[in-house]
Structure formats: C-alpha cells, structure tokens
Amino acid sequence: MASKDTTTGDEANIKLPANDHFEIQSDKASSDASDITYTPPSSSTSMTSASSFGAPASSNEIDASSQPSGVSNISIREYIYLLPYPLPTNTPVPYSIHVPAKNPLKLPPFLSEPTSTLVLTSPHGTFVDVRLFKSAQSGQSAPPNEGERSRLEWAFAGISTSRPTVDQHTTDDEDKWENVTHSTWTHWLDSRYPIGSREIPVDEGDMYPIDAIRTLEHGHGYQPRMKAMMTHEEMWRDVDAMSTNALGSKMCVVLRLKDERFGARGVVVRVGQYCQGIMALVAQESCTVERWEFHGGDAERDNGLGRERTEAQQWKRTARVGDLFLPCAVTFRTEILRVGGLIRYKDYLWTVEEAWEWE
C-alpha cells in the first residue's frame, strides 16, 4: 500500500509582519524548514479594483490593464487511443469514439487510460500538464506522493493557443464536423527535454467537440513506450472550477520562475480546486512536479472553540515527483496575492503573473 501524505496548507504557517510582507513556512514534505517570503508589488502597480482578491468579485480580472484571451480551464484525460501514423487513406476521424462497433483498422477494441492526467490553463493560456502513471500494483491507484520518478509519464508547461479550423478528415461535406478548432501547446518547460532545448517537437492537434463537457484531440507525436511516431486520440473532459472560500468566488493564479543566473524555470497554475506546478534546473536532468487538491467545504471559522478552519488548511498535496521546492501553497492565500508580487525561496524568485477572481 502506498503511503499517504498528510501535508496540508495549514502547515505553511503564514505570518503577517508589520512591514507588509508575509512569511510562509515551506512545505515540510517537499523541502527543508526554511521560510519563503512574499513581497507585494509597489503601490504604483498594485490594483485596487473591485475584482482584486479579497474584494467583491464583480469581474474576473485583477490586472485591469490586461484583457483575457480566454477562460480558465480544468481538463482531465479520460483515455488515449493510439493509431498508425500516417493514417491509412479513408480512415474515419474521430476514430476511437466508434470502437468497438466500428473498427476498420482492426485495432485493440478497448479504450484505456494508463495515467492520471490533469491540465490547468489560465485565461491568458498559461498551462501546466501533469501525467502520472497509475500503479500496476493492487491497492496503489493513487498518484505518487513520495518523489517516485518512475511514475512520471510526462509533465510540461507553456502557452496554449487555439483557432477555428475546418474538418480536414471528412470528405463528405454533409458529414463534416462543426466547431472544430486547432490547438497548439508551446512547451516552455518539458520533463523530457533540457531547459531551452530546440528539440522539443511541435505539440498540436485538432479538437472535436463531442458534447458539452468532452472534447476529442486528434494529433500525432512520438510515443516513447512504442519508440515510434503514432497518431493519437485523447478524450478530454472539462471540470467546473469550484469555489474554495466563504465568499463563493473562484480563483486562478499563475506563478512563474525564470532565473537565467541559476538556470531555473518553473510554473505554478491554480484553477479553482486544483493546483499544479513544475520546476527544472539546467544543472539537473530531472524536474519536480506537484499536484494539490482542495478537500472540504468553504473556509469556515469556529470562534467559539478558539479555532478557525481556513481555506489553506483544506488543501492537500495529492502527487509529487522530485525534490525541488514548489510554492504551490502560496496560491491558497489569494486574499494577499497581487499581480507583480514576488515570492522568494532561497535564491529563487517567483512572480505572480496572473491573478483572477470570478463568480
């Protein structure tokens, strides 16, 4: 049985000194006991609009000077189905949604998902995609939480873009799919490649809307386990963002680390009840990834017992691979964070790049 992590957000032990900085004890399960500090932006850059964290959520933007290019998104992969590349002529696309009733290529007649795959995307298109192998051992279905690198299938972060396109695979105009889009994911960090590598391949695919919450991605790429280029179809299910606070508002936060001196890059994205991060160093071949999930209801207080159950206390780290520190727990203190704020841990300085609130 895999050991369960009991680290929760309340172990961050946030303090608010008089100098308008606050300290957060680092996650004891992911680094040493050193403090990290947050410095808010200067008064010239901090926002005081009604949409700022801690204020009524009348709109979805903290930084009123920047308009969103999209919406926050939470996606869980339901399955991946591999096909030959290139596809034989006249192969129906999408293909996997018809299996096993219609299977002209005589491929495996079942759909499977060997990983726990979650993608979090911000309104400006910054995303973190983490894919962790499910355990083959009975009773170990949960993602790894003790740094087991062998359980990391793939993790990457960057910018996603999407544009309308036409169905390229259906010849009969009457049968062509509508509302198809072409998406591209540019990898700024990739667990399979060194930082700044020019060998990271183009990651793109056509997105076919299946129903109100599911989208099928059709594309192709190199499959390490097959050691070959393969066509793939992935079914993605959208998950609604949930409120984690007593106000009932929903949050999205993006943190970024880019330090050329130390050869460090990192991205943390929180959307609603999920948070994921990835960090890598030029000096290391491997990266660190984390996933956190909110467990419980809205933040609540129990003054009669002299205790308070805060939002931060209800977050739990559900997956971790690697040994670097990731400031995921900082995103749980949205009432303090502002765009442009700086989070320092030892030599590394993270920036609050996006911060959103909506109803």
Predicted region positions:
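Lipid interaction determinants
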Residues: 2-155, 165-359
